[in-house]
Amino acid sequence: MSEPGERVDTFEAPVAPESLDLVQDRLAAFWAHDETVSAADRMRLEMAVVEIVANIVEHAFTVDAGGRALTVALSMTHERVEAVLSDNGLPAEIDLGAVTMPDEDATSGRGLALAVAAVDEVVYDRVEGRNRWRLVCRRTVD
């Protein structure tokens, strides 16, 4: 249910590396509807969204899985910008409270830590056989 003055954009994206470009393009179009969203808030939410989508592409499905589905819902109000990412992949076995940045020599494992650090709230849950990631960035004033 939308709040008064809330802008919402929902779209489907392939669960494939090229979905990152699609998501970034849709975010750019979404930002164009309200130029009062600060550059910092745009960057924070976009970084978190891209990192979570990359993790979905890499980890949520077995290599030969068919029927992959990713839904992205973007919303903004005067107080916040938010993304909800939903996929039908394997459950994520993750404790968000334990996420930390890996050692500097690590070659992977930074994406989720970057997402958690970038936004004000990251929530993961599994609802009706789907993974759901909710990313919230409270808006700041430039």
Regions found by a protein language model. Give the residues of each.
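Short, highly conserved beta-strand within the GHKL-type HATPase_c fold
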Residues: 73, 79-84, 132-134
